[in-house]
Amino acid sequence: MSIFPKKLIKGKDDFTTFHMRICNNSDEDIIGQIKYKVILPDGNSIEMDIDRTEKVDANSELNEYDNFYIKAEYTIGRYFVEGRFIWDGMDILSDTNKDDFFDVITKEGE
């Protein structure tokens, strides 16, 4: 997964976008759900269940984009994001699917 933009200015920027790329190298279609876990700077976390079913055709790739909105009560700091694709009760993304992060800052240049 990847995130853009990586830096958000609190009070100016409203959201960042998570990009999830899922490759299906098997000969069968898979159907599952994307889930995100956002770990806040204070150590608490938010579970984002997108609540939609994704179908990845056999021997193909799926690219999905989801927005994460920055609420007024969110603090300045680094937010870590774990992206998962759940199929048949299992997380099927490989170790190469790296978690990512973004920063909420007070002003440009921080």
Predicted segments, located by residue:
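Short, surface-exposed loop/turn segments at beta-strand-coil junctions that are enriched for proline
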Residues: 69-75
